[in-house]
């Protein structure tokens, strides 16, 4: 009996109640273990409670940059090695320098999941 590879854990932070569960579902279908948060407080509580392979923060237009930057900075100050990515459009991507990676906002769920998977690839099996 072989032991299945560990699921990659993602903390998905998104303040949009309609989009968050859809993106969580897409990521779970791709094999990720997803915890999600609507608020900064909830995100930080979950962040401190367990280890994550990736903290994925949805940036909602230019108005969301400040929220995302503050959260990213707090996480990186506490744990510089933590991988953080923003989900955003190209314009927002040009205005930020905190995250390690950018996942472009996609209307195609498969492209979104593929973007995340390129940042946190599946574990190698022997």
Describe the predicted segments one by one.
Residues 56-77:
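Conserved phosphotransfer microenvironments
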Residues 17, 41, 87-93:
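Short, polar loop motifs at secondary-structure junctions
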Residues 48-50, 74-82:
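Conserved phosphotransfer cores of two-component systems
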Residues 38-54, 62:
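Acidic, metal-coordinating helix/loop segments flanking the phosphotransfer/catalytic sites
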Residues 5-9:
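Phosphate-coordination loops involved in phosphoryl transfer and adenosine-cofactor binding
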Residues 58, 83-89:
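Short beta-strand elements of ligand-binding domains
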Residues 16-35:
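Two-component/phosphorelay signaling modules centered on CheY-like receiver
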Residues 88-125:
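Output/docking surface of receiver
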